[in-house]
């Protein structure tokens, strides 16, 4: 297979934990021809979606800080429909440049390209707002641009989490209680004087046991979750915010949530999704560049990367 991976610069990968790295390793092991490009190197020329893509050889990292784990050749201008699969792995934020990239990908799909996840799905499934489609699994939630609404929501629930709709890695997430002396300044900063839409959710105390990432690949649920456990005194479990990742078997509730969402995600062309679950509550649906492969693979000896490559191969033939 000939595969294009759209991702951040490969030299920036933290190979000891990066999910895209093990995806590439598995695909290289299968003898697939690999190319890399940046989302900013997509363009439309004479009506066709093209990319400045570099073919590369996967060498493998010799240490955690080895940034020479690949050998790239000169970039070539290639149309996306000439690949067997195009895998979008660019990290958020989902800004205007990201939006344009998804529109290019949708056009490429119309021209015959097989894109995972689909451009349309990434536009439709904002990682925070997507949970509103599955309210039976969520804690009380508010989405608003008005700080007065947030204050009323805080008064109702007493202890809440607020977060931007376009963040990642726990950035911009605050916990508020009624006695917090900084409520005003936090809301002004995050909501930019009622000009920025945010999400508020009732605080879920089970966060101390971990914010679980549940992976769904090709409509199938990975049998292990990655519980991201916050540091002492921290409310964010994100690994980027210092959380500790512990792989564990899915609970009955985890499986209920995942198996309910899996068919809908598959229907929408989402080959890979990462559900975030705290306690019994769904908090996010990640579809841009879900992570957690390496921790599950190392701790549970379950080959998530192979499951992903199998799904890419199967879906690319549909």
What are these regions (language model features)?
Residues 1-4:
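Extreme N-terminal starter segment of soluble prokaryotic enzymes
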Residues 6-7, 13-16, 233, 249-318:
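ATP-dependent carboxylate activation and anion-phosphoryl transfer catalytic cores
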Residues 9, 91-93, 165-167, 290:
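Short glycine-rich anion-binding loops that position phosphate/pyrophosphate groups of nucleotides
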Residues 11-29, 35-143:
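Conserved N-proximal alpha/beta basic substrate-recognition cap immediately N-terminal to
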Residues 28, 109, 154-155, 266:
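Anion (oxyanion) recognition and catalysis
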Residues 119-123, 228-230, 278-281:
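Short glycine-enriched loops at secondary-structure junctions
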């Amino acid at each position: 297979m000939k595969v294009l991976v759209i991702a951040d610069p490969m030299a920036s990968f933290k190979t000891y934990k990066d999910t895209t790295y093990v995806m590439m390793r598995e695909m290289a092991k299968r003898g697939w021809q690999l190319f890399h490009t940046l989302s900013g190197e997509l363009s439309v020329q004479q009506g066709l979606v093209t990319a400045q893509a570099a073919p590369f050889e996967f060498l493998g990292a010799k240490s955690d800080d080895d940034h020479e784990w690949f050998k790239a050749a000169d970039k070539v201008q290639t149309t996306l429909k000439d690949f067997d699969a195009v895998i979008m792995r660019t990290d958020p934020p989902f800004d205007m440049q990201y939006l344009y990239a998804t529109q290019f990908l949708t056009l490429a799909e119309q021209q015959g390209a097989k894109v995972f996840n689909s451009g349309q799905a990434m536009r439709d499934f904002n990682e925070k707002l997507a949970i509103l489609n599955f309210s039976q699994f969520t804690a009380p939630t508010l989405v608003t641009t008005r700080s007065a609404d947030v204050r009323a929501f805080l008064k109702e629930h007493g202890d809440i989490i607020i977060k931007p709709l376009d963040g990642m890695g726990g950035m911009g997430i605050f916990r508020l209680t009624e006695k917090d002396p900084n409520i005003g300044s936090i809301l002004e900063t995050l909501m930019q004087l009622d000009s920025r839409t945010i999400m508020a959710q009732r605080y879920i105390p089970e966060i101390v046991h971990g914010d679980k990432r549940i992976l769904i690949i090709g409509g199938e649920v990975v049998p292990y979750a990655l519980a991201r456990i916050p540091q002492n005194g921290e409310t964010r479990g994100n690994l980027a915010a210092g959380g500790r990742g512990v792989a564990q078997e899915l609970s009955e509730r985890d499986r209920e949530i995942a198996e309910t969402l899996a068919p809908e995600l598959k229907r929408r062309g989402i080959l890979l999704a990462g559900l975030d679950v705290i306690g019994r509550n769904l908090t996010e649906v990640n579809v841009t560049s879900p992570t957690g492969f390496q921790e599950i693979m190392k701790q549970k000896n379950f080959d998530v990367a192979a499951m992903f490559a199998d799904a890419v191969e199967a879906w690319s033939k549909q």
